[in-house]
């Protein structure tokens, strides 16, 4: 089965929206330091660009949580692959994610991080698929709401491919 990619959000659209989110976070946390927690691998492209656009002090940490196999649907099974290196105690934490889909993974992750005692905990996602939501998740900063299509680019992959695309594209499968 071959696939092709159709552009959903251009590089320019994505870049402009990330700038706006960076400005919003800078205003919301003015006078404070924010601790960004990147959910790897997909969130890395978004977090790197976002961090450059935040004008207040920022610290970074990374974790890897898996709920996808080689398929196009979330498996619903959450596994922590890499945990954080730093404590979240008393920090203003923003979890940076590439996409919110069913909400299962992030619900689990946010509950786990909440138990670590941050001063505040918010979620920032580049993409949100509200039509796929199974578990309610409070997203504080959203880049784009998108339809229920399988997307790649800007860190999102299909079977480890297409992460490097500078735009968000829809995978279209040839039958």
Predicted region positions:
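PRPP-associated nucleotide enzymes
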Residues: 1-175
